[in-house]
């Protein structure tokens, strides 16, 4: 008699736990009208640049994103969105898996951007693909971070002479040169 009672209690507990789990939903995507987050930043529109479908230029895409609290997180969020690729027309220009490791910003507008090794390892293209990858990154950062005037790209903590052999990356890139 004791065995069936234990099974019945166990089933009741399991049913209660299942009901509790079902009541807690996964977080929903934040609507554009969301209230500010705990840092007071809220949601803002960002402009991302992707390769055009025919691969000869960049196309802009606007997204509503939660504004991160720190500068590092703002940069990391922009790069992560580029890595996710476009929602509309266009093609991701960054090598897949590119992520921000570190960000250094000086008082003269120089952003030193340390990206993961996937940036270099994942690149398999020619001069146009290289241009589009760098332009996508620099234009997106410049469009959304007005304090950034120049970008120096570093890969996994080491200087990067070039991505694909065509564009020099061993010196800072002027944002204004990538309109």
Could you say what each language-model-derived stretch is?
Residues 1-179:
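Bimodal "functional hotspot" detector
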């Amino acid at each position: 008699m004791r065995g069936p009672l234990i099974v019945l209690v166990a089933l009741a507990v399991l049913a209660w736990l299942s009901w509790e789990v079902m009541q807690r939903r996964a977080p929903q995507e934040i609507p554009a009208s969301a209230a500010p987050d705990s840092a007071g930043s809220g949601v803002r529109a960002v402009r991302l640049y992707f390769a055009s479908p025919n691969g000869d230029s960049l196309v802009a895409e606007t997204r509503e994103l939660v504004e991160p609290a720190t500068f590092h997180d703002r940069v990391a969020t922009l790069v992560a969105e580029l890595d996710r690729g476009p929602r509309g027309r266009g093609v991701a220009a960054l090598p897949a898996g590119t992520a921000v490791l570190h960000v250094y910003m000086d008082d003269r507008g120089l952003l030193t951007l340390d990206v993961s090794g996937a940036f270099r390892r994942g690149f398999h293209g020619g001069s146009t693909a290289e241009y589009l990858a760098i332009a996508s990154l620099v234009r997106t950062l410049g469009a959304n971070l007005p304090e950034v005037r120049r970008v120096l790209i570093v890969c996994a903590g080491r200087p990067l002479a070039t991505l694909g052999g065509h564009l020099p990356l061993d010196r800072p890139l002027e944002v204004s040169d990538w309109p």
